[in-house]
Amino acid sequence: MSPCGYYSKWRNRDRPEYRRNLRFRRFFSSIHPNAAAGSGFNGPGVFITSVTGVWLCFLCIFSMFVTAVVSVSPSSFYESLQVEPTQSEDITRSAHLGDGDEIREAIHKSQDAETKPTFYVCPPPTGSTIVRLEPTRTCPDYHLGKNFTEGIAVVYKENIAAYKFKATVYYKDVIVSTAWAGSSYTQITNRYADRVPIPVSEITDTIDKFGKCSSKATYVRNNHKVEAFNEDKNPQDMPLIASKYNSVGSKAWHTTNDTYMVAGTPGTYRTGTSVNCIIEEVEARSIFPYDSFGLSTGDIIYMSPFFGLRDGAYREHSNYAMDRFHQFEGYRQRDLDTRALLEPAARNFLVTPHLTVGWNWKPKRTEVCSLVKWREVEDVVRDEYAHNFRFTMKTLSTTFISETNEFNLNQIHLSQCVKEEARAIINRIYTTRYNSSHVRTGDIQTYLARGGFVVVFQPLLSNSLARLYLQELVRENTNHSPQKHPTRNTRSRRSVPVELRANRTITTTSSVEFAMLQFTYDHIQEHVNEMLARISSSWCQLQNRERALWSGLFPINPSALASTILDQRVKARILGDVISVSNCPELGSDTRIILQNSMRVSGSTTRCYSRPLISIVSLNGSGTVEGQLGTDNELIMSRDLLEPCVANHKRYFLFGHHYVYYEDYRYVREIAVHDVGMISTYVDLNLTLLKDREFMPLQVYTRDELRDTGLLDYSEIQRRNQMHSLRFYDIDKVVQYDSGTAIMQGMAQFFQGLGTAGQAVGHVVLGATGALLSTVHGFTTFLSNPFGALAVGLLVLAGLVAAFFAYRYVLKLKTSPMKALYPLTTKGLKQLPEGMDPFAEKPNATDTPIEEIGDSQNTEPSVNSGFDPDKFREAQEMIKYMTLVSAAERQESKARKKNKTSALLTSRLTGLALRNRRGYSRVRTENVTGV
């Protein structure tokens, strides 16, 4: 047996153990000149000793080894053999030989394992356990679905939009206004407005015939017949003019722009009537079940728009008496803009309490449909799954599910438009896309999908498949002669009579998210199922192929193949057509493994070991077992693996978690696993990833469709009502009412009623009155000026002052006329002494004139001074005669003006009377002195 070698790695060389082990190495280097790489021996270190000493040492060691081997039986060794590698920062693999000299024990302690490798002890199989390879399997064939059919589809939904048509509204706007005329203002005290329907006779004979409308309105209110006239004048036909403002899709015509109102003379009430004939072309809307329709004016007509007198239309709904409804065949309506007659049509007229509405009658079945097209899909795949049809539409990212039975469209009320429209769409798509590559298979098919959708489907078949089917059909007809089969009293699925439910309707959901989720689920399911099916089939085929390979490789290396198949370390051997296996237990923690540094056979120069030599040492004292290192850390309990020695020998062996490198059958160094390149025997599984599917924002019903669901469009009604005043009345025109103008109008009407002569006189009178009114107007205008008002104020103030003084003068004339007329003459009367009687007689009164009284202020008056009674009486007579003279002159003047005899005669008589009364004497003016 060759000497033992060892290798180790040291970090702390100053330790006592290192120095002691170094002595041991020097000792062993004298025994074997070629030290292992990394063992610490730098040279051959040949130490010549005596032959006796060498043999003594060898015999001692060999005897100890033999004793240890003999003392341990194989069975007890396998029972106690375990591996427990030690672990440290720098661990050396060591081997402990149990009881022996301390040199061998030190060598074993110095070799610690670097990591925790797992080693297996594989005893040779004895044939007690045999196995065999499973024969090849039959791989399954998976089908994801059946009856896949491609085609074209048109999807329909419930029609929730209103039926729209044009209607014409005829009415007269009657406004009666009562106004109070003040001195400088006008006030409306009452206003009555009403809409009056226009009779159908006036529409047909006047409006649509001449483009005019009467200014007279006749209507019934409070069960009484009432008439109104525009501007309170005699009725006349007035031309219809277009309105100033029109909304989208609406036009209107009317007869006047003004609202008539009368302002009378101040302090009176006047009433004015305005009649405006209005014709509006508006939009009418009706929703299912079409028993009424609404107008954009806000009015609701409780009659079906399809009510008529022919083709059974009289069965439609109506809430009005028949005398209010009129239908004319071939009626030609007049275009009020171009004045041209339109094409003949069946025209309906309905008279309501407030308006007359007219519209063109059309049959119901040709105008409305309870279903409407939602989407056209050019490529659809239909498959049968779980007794249902699934229509997959990738362009819409949706999947619709329906029953396998076709749906009869005749069950749905007013669904006659679906097949005709769908057929036209399918023909167009087929002609433009599939005409050269596919053929149609049968007629179009109709299915009711979940959610209330109707799918009209046209199956298609590619030309290549069609040719294969034809060839197969020809082959079958050739091989099998035609035989007559007894007819069975059965029907095909499509011809099964279905009990129809009258007037059935469907309700479509407003969201299509459920179909999109169904499409996503089906897409994921299809992808996963297809992937799993391919994996299963490929896996089965791969197993069959690997089985054939393993069957051929088992004779070469049965242990490796058996370990791979059984997923555990075993030892195998071929025994004919079966394989004998034995289990390979792991070494426990109470064992150590020593790797020797030489692979040469001791005593031979041509024989070498093909695997490194090892020694398995039990730490519990059970002994040491010699063997070889097998593949993949397998420990072989024999040293039978030999080979001829070759030159340039280089080998790498896995030992634990590292590779050990041998060159020329000598240990060189240890190599880490990651420093050795790796080639993989595995085949990557190429799987297709799940494709990205984005949800498209699909709308079943658009915003316009949802807005059209109601009977009335309130936005259009509000727009029309707010525009009504702008369309038919001039809101910018202002009429200034004048009381003088009212007087003139009243006088003019009065003179016009007197005939031609009265009108001539009226012109003269109205001219003079107009001049007077103009003067008054100018005066009032002057007063309205601030400066004119100030001047008038000053004049009024001056007039008041003058009036005050005049009033005082008149009072003075009344109380003392002589003082007022002769203030200087009567001035001396104020100077009479107190107590003096002005009428008392005095001596020599005739000699002293009255003017001398009080001539001198220093002369005291005489007690007997006073007035002369005769003079006083003469003065009285003179005043009387002056009054008579004044009266006579006035009478004569009047007589001359009037040229009347009685007045002249009276004047003459008055003069004669005055002449007969001349018995007075003249008052002396000079001073009379006494004789």
Curated annotation (Swiss-Prot):
GO biological process terms, semicolon-separated: symbiont entry into host cell; virion attachment to host cell
Location of the motif Golgi targeting: 881-884
Post-translational modification: A proteolytic cleavage by host furin generates two subunits that remain linked by disulfide bonds.
Signal peptide: 1-71
Membrane topology: Single-pass type I membrane protein
Virion surface side: 72-786
Name of the protein in question: Envelope glycoprotein B
Lineage, uppermost ranks: Viruses, Duplodnaviria, Heunggongvirae, Peploviricota, Herviviricetes
